[in-house]
Amino acid sequence: EIVNVEVWAWTEKRLYTEQEVRLENEKKRSYAVVWHIQRNQIVPLATSEVPEVRFQEQRDAPLALGFTEEPYAQYLTSEGTAHKDLYALDVQTGARQRIVRDLRCNPSLSPATRYILWWSDPDTAWYAWSAATQKIRPLTNTRLSDFHETDNDVPDFPSAYGAAGWMENDAALIVYDQYDLWKTDPLGVQAPVRLTQGYTTKTRYRYLRLDPERRYLRPDETLLLHSFNTLTKAEGYARLDL
């Protein structure tokens, strides 16, 4: 009698059933490269150590984001949340630099690729890494306001309220707290500024993005906001001059 035995150890990072599902995909895995046409050179970006690469939407940026979940694979099984190390990848040379370890979120590149932005669940704060200074700076903190979902009722870290978007040339990032919009400086030179006054009346303001292809906000424009009073349930629209 032939017996099929599946041998698996508790020390393995992934469950055996997950390994079986991933096996075929891993056999067919491809790695992102860049072909520089003018110099006829192919530059590998993804590797077995950093297999995941994310490009800016227009795919014309000098930087790309690299990820690896392998050191934290067991967390996906136990927590249901993917942890990852974040890398900045030089599209010209393929050189990579590890920015931060053990992230639980999905970072993004700013429109002008001057910064890498992410939300830190444990700190409940926004962070940005500067390509120019090679430094990480917090954009918000809980002393100013709560930028995380205060009514989170699950046994996990709360999510961010989100962001309205970047200003032109990555000059600032506008983020949300429970009610208001805040203008933050990714260089840390200027303190965050509250742009609306929703807290006093418990009115929530959110930016209405009328053009989904807009990459940034201009400093001289007027934003259309949606307003919702959490006490009276009245809603409407407002204008905000940047």
Task: Report residues per predicted region.
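Beta-propeller folds
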Residues: E1-L242
